Amino acid sequence: MTIMNGFELHYLSFVYAQEFSSKNNNLGGQMKHIIALASKIAFTLALLYVILDRVYHASFLSVMFIALFLGFVSYLSGDMLVLPRTNNITASLADFGLSFVILWVFVLTQTRNDFSPFGAALLSAACLTVFEYFFHRYLLKNVLDENFRNELSARDNTLQYQTEAADELFPETKEKHKE
């Protein structure tokens, strides 16, 4: 029986981890999305708790429900549909609009109206948009696969300018000049 030193043990664990990840490559991609979604919901809950519960006195259960709903909807629509087809700024603005509308309806229906629901929704959506900008950067760097990142960078860096050349609609002919 031989005793392994730290380097050999680290190397063997690295080799086994590589074999496991190559066999379960799809599982690793799914796990990245689950971790990203869970962190998004957790941060959304923390942010909405501070703004809506502490400042505007909404119930914690309502804030937790809206954080779950908003997290799922914005992850599926903004992060998985809009972000891959556009850029970070456009996806963040789309998330702002979506979260503003959802939060405005929530604040109108679930809280006491001794404050401006528009202001509460606007403040919450603006804070969430700042978080979304950095979250999108994280998604592009760590969660979305490398092929997608290469396609995105190639698409953004190769501008294709096109011009159109055509003849005139009614060209002047020599016969018309003689008249």
Curated annotation (Swiss-Prot):
Pfam families hit by this protein: DUF2512
GO cellular-component term (any): plasma membrane
Transmembrane region(s): 33-53, 63-83, 89-109, 115-135
Membrane-related topology note: Multi-pass membrane protein
Protein name per the record: Uncharacterized membrane protein YndM
Keyword set, alphabetical order: Cell membrane, Membrane, Transmembrane, Transmembrane helix
Entry's localization field: Cell membrane
Major localization class: membrane
Lineage: Bacteria, Bacillati, Bacillota, Bacilli, Bacillales
InterPro entries the UniProt entry points to: DUF2512
Keyword Cell membrane: yes
Gene name of this polypeptide: yndM
The species this protein was found in: Bacillus subtilis (strain 168)
